[in-house]
């Protein structure tokens, strides 16, 4: 059985930065350090930070006064920022800079009183943070997930609209929704470059590259990781039996029956150690050759805040 590794895979610059911010805050200020929401969607990473003294909370009212809080890579609403400021909490912002870019787009159209349509998944922390950049007294912001949502969408002024998207969506699905928006609202405007982040795009492209070369695809990533789920969905759409796994322990040996080539990739919040463990497990199940499939090299690095360097 050949093991074909997709490239790129695993950590992206935004995840690296977010984890580094929590680690550096713990190094400099000591435990406890509070983090609003999982800093990234990966249990292994979160548990490791918990062991070092990070405390993960859902809301700021769980953070005691005079403490340090870190906002997760997914970003937060303006209301959350204001609450932290009002309480004089020490804040470090681990929001991915590419998410911040979308926040700035939404804030800009809100100030101009332009209705905004966000393409994204309801309930995802990034979507909640992005929706929360839009002022409640402006024209309005709407969330759509599919062309069907677009078909039933009613806006106040079809001639004055702007769209943007969650950064971790399926590239193909997002293009379908954008096409539906442009067909229904010909004057709608959007970002010069789509909001899907480079890491999401590259990892989906890498799956496309190897999908027709493998009999099975394993995606290392958490069940609540948007970009990991999109990788699994993409491989499945391309006709490959695919599974999303947290760790090597999730591999079921009957998946490998009759499999000659297995592809391995990982979401942007999955650490290299978990990918390595999956490869080692596959070797123990009969994998005799590991092939690194060539892909796009990533050199982007996002700096941590100056106070933490």
Curated annotation (Swiss-Prot):
Give residues annotated as binding isopentenyl diphosphate: 41, 74, 124, 225-227, 269
Which Gene Ontology molecular function entries are recorded, alphabetically? 4 iron, 4 sulfur cluster binding; 4-hydroxy-3-methylbut-2-enyl diphosphate reductase activity; metal ion binding
Q: Which residues form the active site?
A: 126
Q: What is its EC number?
A: 1.17.7.4
InterPro entries the UniProt entry points to: LytB/IspH
Q: Which pathway, per its entry?
A: Isoprenoid biosynthesis; dimethylallyl diphosphate biosynthesis; dimethylallyl diphosphate from (2E)-4-hydroxy-3-methylbutenyl diphosphate: step 1/1; Isoprenoid biosynthesis; isopentenyl diphosphate biosynthesis via DXP pathway; isopentenyl diphosphate from 1-deoxy-D-xylulose 5-phosphate: step 6/6
EC top class, as a word: oxidoreductase
> Which residues pair up as cystines?
none
Cofactors that this protein relies on: [4Fe-4S] cluster
Cofactor: binding comment:
Binds 1 [4Fe-4S] cluster per subunit.
Q: Which reaction does it catalyse?
A: isopentenyl diphosphate + 2 oxidized [2Fe-2S]-[ferredoxin] + H2O = (2E)-4-hydroxy-3-methylbut-2-enyl diphosphate + 2 reduced [2Fe-2S]-[ferredoxin] + 2 H(+); dimethylallyl diphosphate + 2 oxidized [2Fe-2S]-[ferredoxin] + H2O = (2E)-4-hydroxy-3-methylbut-2-enyl diphosphate + 2 reduced [2Fe-2S]-[ferredoxin] + 2 H(+)
Give binding positions for dimethylallyl diphosphate.
Answer: 41, 74, 124, 225-227, 269
| Positions that bind (2E)-4-hydroxy-3-methylbut-2-enyl diphosphate | 41, 74, 124, 167, 225-227, 269
According to its UniProt record, what is one Pfam family this protein matches? LYTB
Tell me the residue numbers annotated for binding [4Fe-4S] cluster: 12, 96, 197
- List UniProt keywords, sorted A-Z: 4Fe-4S, Iron, Iron-sulfur, Isoprene biosynthesis, Metal-binding, Oxidoreductase
Is the keyword NADP assigned to this protein? no
Chain's role: Catalyzes the conversion of 1-hydroxy-2-methyl-2-(E)-butenyl 4-diphosphate (HMBPP) into a mixture of isopentenyl diphosphate (IPP) and dimethylallyl diphosphate (DMAPP). Acts in the terminal step of the DOXP/MEP pathway for isoprenoid precursor biosynthesis.
What family is reported?
Belongs to the IspH family.
Name-wise, this protein is 4-hydroxy-3-methylbut-2-enyl diphosphate reductase
Native species: Colwellia psychrerythraea (strain 34H / ATCC BAA-681) (Vibrio psychroerythus)
């Amino acid at each position: 059985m050949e093991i074909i590794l997709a490239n790129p895979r695993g950590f992206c610059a935004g995840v690296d930065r977010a984890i580094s911010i929590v680690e550096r805050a713990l190094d400099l200020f000591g435990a406890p350090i509070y983090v609003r929401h999982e800093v990234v969607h990966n249990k292994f990473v979160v548990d490791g930070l918990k062991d070092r003294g990070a405390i993960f909370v859902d809301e700021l009212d769980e953070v005691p006064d005079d403490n340090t809080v870190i906002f997760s890579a997914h970003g937060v609403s303006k209301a959350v920022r204001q609450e932290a400021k009002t309480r004089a909490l020490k804040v470090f912002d681990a929001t991915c800079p590419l998410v911040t870019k979308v926040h700035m787009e939404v804030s800009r159209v809100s100030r101009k009183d332009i209705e905004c349509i966000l393409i994204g998944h309801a309930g995802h922390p990034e979507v909640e943070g992005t929706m929360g950049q839009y002022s409640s007294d402006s024209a309005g912001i709407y969330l759509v997930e599919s062309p069907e949502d677009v078909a039933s969408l009613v806006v106040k002024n079809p001639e004055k609209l702007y769209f943007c998207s969650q950064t971790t969506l399926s590239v193909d699905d997002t293009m379908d929704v954008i096409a539906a928006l442009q067909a229904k609202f010909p004057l709608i405007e959007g970002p010069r470059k789509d909001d899907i982040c480079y890491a999401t795009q590259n990892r989906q492209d890498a799956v496309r590259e190897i999908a027709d070369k493998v009999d099975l695809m394993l995606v290392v990533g958490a069940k609540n990781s948007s970009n990991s789920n999109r990788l699994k969905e993409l491989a499945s759409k391309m006709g490959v039996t695919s599974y999303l796994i947290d760790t090597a322990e999730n591999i079921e040996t009957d998946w490998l029956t009759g499999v000659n080539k297995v592809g391995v990739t990982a979401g942007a919040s999955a650490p290299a150690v978990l990918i390595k463990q999956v490869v080692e497990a596959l070797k123990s199940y009969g994998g005799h050759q590991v092939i690194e499939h060539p892909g796009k090299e990533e050199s982007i690095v996002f700096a941590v805040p100056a106070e933490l360097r």
